């Protein structure tokens, strides 16, 4: 399963959070849960550079801190990373 679905856009997520929460969080939760139930062999999730928040570096690195996104969009993408990590550990869903 490759999940590229999301409502994108940093600015709009601040003024209109509803669709971001519904699609990026609830929708993601539904997809990963169904992937587990249907015994999907591998789950791939496309996150976003928005999880790096206010990082001022020109090139982000995987070791950079990603716990302070500056938009709701970035927060939903980071939340999904954590959910995917937990599904991988709790239910042995390869991610």
Residues covered by each model-derived region:
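Catalytic helix-loop patch of NAD(P)-dependent Rossmann-fold dehydrogenases
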Residues: 15-33, 37, 41-42, 51-95
């Amino acid at each position: 399963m490759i999940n590229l679905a999301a409502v994108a856009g940093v600015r709009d997520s601040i003024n209109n959070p509803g669709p971001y929460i519904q699609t990026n969080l609830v929708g993601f939760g539904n997809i990963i849960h169904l992937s587990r139930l249907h015994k999907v062999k591998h789950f791939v999730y496309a996150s976003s550079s928005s999880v790096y928040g206010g990082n001022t570096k020109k090139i982000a690195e995987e070791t950079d801190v990603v716990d302070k996104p500056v938009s709701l969009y970035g927060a939903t993408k980071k939340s999904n990373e954590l959910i995917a990590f937990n599904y991988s550990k709790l239910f042995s869903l390869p991610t």
